[in-house]
């Protein structure tokens, strides 16, 4: 009974929740969640809000589960009556926009989610017109909820990003990548016309090798001059065949 009384002693009861570091996450919602976690008693006797017996593990678990934009989380007591929650938010580097490019161009950019640099989906994205963010169109599997999922293994995702960066360095401008049912990738390039040219490559391709092949081809004057001079009429560049770079223009 004495310990129960001590746990409720006002001097040691947390009454103030401060949330810092948020930009997009609602700080008030975080504070409300923490207050909910520390309300009530343990086994009807010991007050959860007592600074010495706070349910810190549950607070951490609940924040990370509900606010998946959270990348780093620090929970710190300030005196006896204040709890400071410091959050570092994930930054959105890319978008995942479903399993395929919408046939209706007006829906491009709808229903997208932010991805971090590991390919982890952590938040819904507002509508962006144009190509503000690079987009991934990759099937997640049946009944897989997007939030909290990885679009690809972290290793594969980073490998594709490295390939995209390499293509960009060659003077081309990737805007999205699609993985179709045949496990083949289509890397779409920006264009001033309605139809975007694309680079085709296989899922099992060694991306370092095919990037090297593309680099070698672009450094050949005849290839470079033809592709760049007719860029807006380019249909595709095909890297699916070993040590070959094929290309085709729209007729």
Over which residues does each language-model region extend?
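Charged, solvent-exposed interaction patches on well-folded alpha/beta domains
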Residues: 1-18, 23, 27-33, 41-251
